[in-house]
Amino acid sequence: MEGSLLVASSASNNETANNVESTDGATRRISFAKIHEPLDVPNLLALQTESFDWLVGNGRWQDRMQKAVDAGDESVATTSGLSDIFEEISPIEDFQGTMSLSFSEPEFADPKYTMAECKDRDATFSAPLYVKAEFMNNNTGEIKQQTVFMGDFPLMTEKGTFVINGTERVVVSQLVRSPGAYFERTADKTSDKDIFTAKIIPSRGAWFELEIDKRDQVGVRLDRKRKQSVTVLLKALGWTESQILEEFGEFDSIRATLEKDGTSTREDALLDIYRKLRPGEPPTVEAAQTLLDNLYFNPKRYDLAKVGRYKINRKLGIDKSLASPDASVLDINDIVAIIKFLVTLHAGGKSLTAKRDGKDFELRVDVDDIDHFGNRRIRAVGELIENQVRTGLSRMERVVRERMTTQDVEAITPQTLINIRPVVAAIKEFFGTSQLSQFMDQNNPLAGLTHKRRLSALGPGGLSRDRAGYEVRDVHPSHYGRMCPIETPEGPNIGLIGSLASYGRINPLGFIETPYRKVSKGHVSDEVDYLTADDELNYIIAQANAPLDSKSSFVEDQVLVRQRGGGGEPVLVAADDVEYMDVSPRQMVSVATALIPFLEHDDANRALMGANMQRQAVPLVRSEAPVVGTGMERAAAVDAGDVVIAKKAGVVTEVSADLVIMLNDDGTETNYRIAKYNRSNQGTAYNQRVLVSEGARLEVGGIIADGPATDQGELALGKNLLVAFMSWEGHNFEDAIILSQRLVSEDVLSSIHIEEHEIDARDTKLGAEEITRDIPNVSEEILAGLDERGIIHIGAEVDAGDILVGKVTPKGETELTPEERLLRAIFGDKSGEVRDTSLKVPHGESGTVIGVRFFDRENDDDLAPGVNQLVRIYVAAKRKITNGDKLAGRHGNKGVISKILPIEDMPFLADGTPVDIVLNPLGVPGRMNVGQVLELHLGWIAKTGWKIDGEPDWVKNLPNLPRETGRDQILATPVFDGAREEEISGLLDSTNVTRDGDLLINRSGKTRLFDGRSGEPFPDPISVGYMYILKLHHLVDDKIHARSTGPYSMITQQPLGGKAQFGGQRFGEMEVWALEAYGAAYTLQELLTIKSDDIHGRVKVYEAIVKGENIPEPGIPESFKVLIKEMRSLCLNVEVLSTEGSTIEMRDSDEEVFRAAEELGIDLSRAEPNSVEEV
């Protein structure tokens, strides 16, 4: 992705703008940036793709690994994730050790279906995984080799998603506590002493905990069991009392512990440990030794992982190679080192002498901050799937062991031993049900991109939202450049779910690194180093906006920096002392936050809403890039993967709506498929539009087609509208919005939504269901839109209740007489034996049928067991903007449309231009999101163009700003490095004049507006300008709902609730009080009985209405009967008495009700719902 396309100020030839087209169709933005950035924004999907590449060990990963090895980087993994697991589990030996089975060289065959076919067929996009399995008989030395199929392994698409059962899903990266050694200090509740604890947390296996209590004794807790003296453990590991005193004699805490310790020999110590860990079992020295070995010293049972060993080495000053075979388990040196660190900490020591790379150095002794990003790491996709495969293989290992003992040695082959079911099931379970495998958010390209870059502290092995306190959720200084401090959800997950910062990347150990420019002796170079949160603590780092001269040296002698050791306030230091400098001002924020212009003028809470609401923007019929952008729009759109990009340089040879063919410079030909009106996960239209014509030349990365919500390869989530900040007859009170009818009639804010409707024909006990046009008791005009198969034709306009697919289901009935059977055979009267179960358009929906997919078992389509045919209908509807829809800007300024005014009634400017939208000015000061006002002014400047006379002071910082432009410019004002207030004021004064020679808006940003109804001017000047407005997914059409008669709850017989259940409105407790207060007794009685759960009454009312009779008296509601039943279950005999004192019988005669129901054609038999939606 070329940096020069992001900002015009970095282009050498600054053409006078009029949207100069570059070779690849992207438009040039005029940028207000002043800071040179040595590094482009990296590939924003690398978090997902690189992790998965490592797991499967594909070509891209091998190239990257080779580069890293050539560059001398030792931290990079040299074996793929799958190879690691198979190596780890090999060899599987039987209980006697006579046979072994080992695995190597995992390989993938080609996928069965392409990604598009998988979406069509509801299949999983996966490739068959094969492994070389070797069976060895240790007695005879005989070896049998086979290549074994290990199941279908889901593959990641180019966009970083997975297609599982036909739907796109994303695996979210998890933020977890890193394995390693941790030290804590807590105040004792009973005394004023501090209690010190140490823990070694492994990647998997038993915890090892030490504690110095208020009596100054050092206790150890193995595997979360009872506490015992640490000296007992040391003796069990072979140390004598004199060795312990020699090593720890200077510490009172260890001396006190030794005095209390009653064991003298190693055997005693082992037995003592065994009694504590396995109370009730007879202790033996061998069993105790095995138990202890298995807990911490056996690689099969205990694994620190590379990262755990790295953290322990760093924390305790141990010099043990990460590559050594026993690096993943503890040894006596680790245990001694952690005890020494803890007792030093308790004694008030500040440092220890330790070794690193063979040299002595001072090790700082301090407690840990577990929320620091040096102690929290990322488990990305690759590692999450790897853990799942490991689980599956360990289950398979048990099966293999059992089969080794039961099968005949001669007949055994690897194939007969292996059962791949547990492995396949583990992978399926992870992708289908894990909390971290999520249905992809496809509202717009940004929503998908952000979803893939999400970091979640929830999920298996993570936190739970109920138990997470404030500390974990809080913004931490180590988040800088790693996790965005702004973008996080509102609500119970706040702070637990974050987003990776724009420049952040994950190192091989799972820690997030962020780039810094190297500084030496006050000179800032373009050399970039990536630092983890731990590394960063050792340096003095300046921020990106520290002023530099033309030679990249600091202008000022004193520079504002973040101190060594982190935390604390920024301080001023001499320029020569600075060691690193931020790469870019937007380094600390995520992609969505970096798309908010003038973010620096917005309150953080509103910026959070702005970042989150951009993800809810619906792609509009015609996309329009923002006139006031931040320069991040192109990177976001391209990396989201919804824009079609040239993979190789070449010339376009053929263009059609859904296919572009390019002849590449290397002689090959590439076909680029263009998606047309597909349905996204959220029901929005996923449509791509070709931008190139035949004969056009494109370089690598050139844009071939725009996707949804992109414009010329830039992210375009909304529309630039003319906004006035004023009150209008109180219609924009409390964030309500007034719109112009123009936006409705010209489809400015219209969007296309596509719904999918599905029906299948199954085998039932009474016979097969049939998809047919021959439906009983349905008139021909209703069937007019169906073809001969009974399926609606493409292009048909449908409304709620229309039949999309005709289907009949056999129903059981009494035996027919031979005469009836004969008549039926002659006249083909089916009505008696089948019922109509056709697929109809649900309530409140309508649109045009744009797609039909028909699957039939006879055509060899893969269908679920018992399903013979499956039909999918796609219905598209154009939703115009309407009252009740939600609009928002990019600064958290959201509102609901209250009134749509005719164009002639809208306020208008002096040149007659009516405004598009009227917002309430009171929405700005209290919310402190002033960025929207600056955007408004700059939007006006961009739309009108400018002509600068002379060289005023404010222009000197903008050498690349064109001095004269036409109308309709597009600008970039990057986050924390954007247009300043004096620049905006100066440009407002210099904007182009109207045909009459008037300057409509001067440096105040305000103008005189006229009332469209009277033509009179409003008394005060009003802020007017262009603002970028998004239409959010909260559309009133999806929410509005009405019910006539519908389903009732089984027990209370009251109507169900909610639109999905076609439910009623709840008339709750408080509403009842209101009617009681007004004395509206009859209205209330109706609501509580015949309109709700008086079963017989409601049928009789229906009958009375149909026959035109008076409404009958209400009966007893069902809920009252339920109440009486509940009281009877408590042994209280409750009777209902009439006013005369006679007992009222609670049973009504059902015959009458069923008679009335039959007459009126009401179906009282409660059909079992086919799906959750019908409940």
Curated annotation (Swiss-Prot):
The keyword Nucleotidyltransferase applies. Gene3D superfamilies: 2.40.50.100, 2.40.50.150, 3.90.1100.10, DNA-directed RNA polymerase, beta subunit, external 1 domain (2.30.150.10), DNA-directed RNA polymerase, subunit 2, domain 6 (2.40.270.10), RNA polymerase alpha subunit dimerisation domain (3.90.1800.10), RNA polymerase Rpb2, domain 2 (3.90.1110.10). Residues 7-23 have a biased composition (Low complexity). Residues 1-24 are annotated as: Disordered. GO terms for molecular function: DNA binding; DNA-directed RNA polymerase activity; ribonucleoside binding. InterPro entries: DNA-dir_RNA_pol_bsu_ext_1_sf, DNA-dir_RNA_pol_bsu_external_1, DNA-dir_RNA_pol_su2, DNA-dir_RNAP_su2_dom, DNA-dir_RNAP_su2_hyb_sf, RNA_pol_bsu_bac, RNA_pol_bsu_CS, RNA_pol_bsu_protrusion. The keyword Transport does not apply. It catalyses: RNA(n) + a ribonucleoside 5'-triphosphate = RNA(n+1) + diphosphate. It holds the Pfam family RNA_pol_Rpb2_45. Keywords: DNA-directed RNA polymerase, Nucleotidyltransferase, Transcription, Transferase. Its EC number is 2.7.7.6. GO terms for cellular component: DNA-directed RNA polymerase complex. One of its GO terms (biological process) is DNA-templated transcription. It comes from the Bacteria. CDD domains: RNA_pol_B_RPB2. Belongs to the RNA polymerase beta chain family. NCBIfam families: PRK00405.1, rpoB. HAMAP family: RNApol_bact_RpoB (MF_01321). The RNAP catalytic core consists of 2 alpha, 1 beta, 1 beta' and 1 omega subunit. When a sigma factor is associated with the core the holoenzyme is formed, which can initiate transcription. DNA-dependent RNA polymerase catalyzes the transcription of DNA into RNA using the four ribonucleoside triphosphates as substrates. This is DNA-directed RNA polymerase subunit beta.
